[in-house]
């Protein structure tokens, strides 16, 4: 009887699979011309961490010129502040609480550059535009539920689809908040010399792509808002779990598509590409970097079931955690090399929620938001180096 049931189940799966087709896409960009492909025809829409830094250096210098033009009275010797917000899914509640507490204390800088990856990419535009959006972030990261992010697909999606979940709900959420008004405000800040940079991973090219959101916003292109929304969705697209985002580009008159996913597949955070270091090192101005790591930086002990899926999940989480820690350490040493003042915030061992950790559990996120808020209000949040390194105490 059992054998008959198993056979029937396998036949049903086979018939279901027979009606499935792999999602289609346009050809990827040829390797030889990859860096010449331009989304929306914009030359400064994006940059590559591992590519020729000439264009990015030119963009940084133009931003400095715009800043001087916007504020002619500036002496040019003030401190330039960077903010980098990492990935971390629902742990983005930590950043949301920290930012609001920082605003209340009154010491939150007007950042010259804000960067974001994954959940940090969703937070970054609002952090970039200032404390007016603190309440919005509080609402998002204390009431969010999984059904507002994704819809689960059947198991056959593992073989015949592009992700185990459909992120149409996330696209709708992004569409609600990322509107023309928001884009116009970003363009206005770009005109003042400020930069908003979002990281995605191009799976075809296996490269981290840094999107210059201000330039896209200021382009006036009718499809700029659509591209902005797709970038935000792509930066949060966990490979395999969430569907990727296909971005249209053009090269030599031919149309191609690039497959973009979570920037965390390459780096869970970035402050600035290392190639820009000489600009900071040779400048008379002071540079200060603030990094918000939406996660812990120590091991998360837990018993692993002796099951294939459990072992694989635990191994992936371990690799992700290790990658995040390495990104923080890398940012620290790059900052030290360039003489940039380093400040790091992360979820510490003193965060012990009484509620269960789960996929977008509002009670857990509310507790984490309150933790970040209280840490900022107490001025007990910034560390001068990653844990375990000399001088890793709290900066006050």
Predicted region positions:
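Patatin-like phospholipase
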Residues: 8, 21-112, 128-396
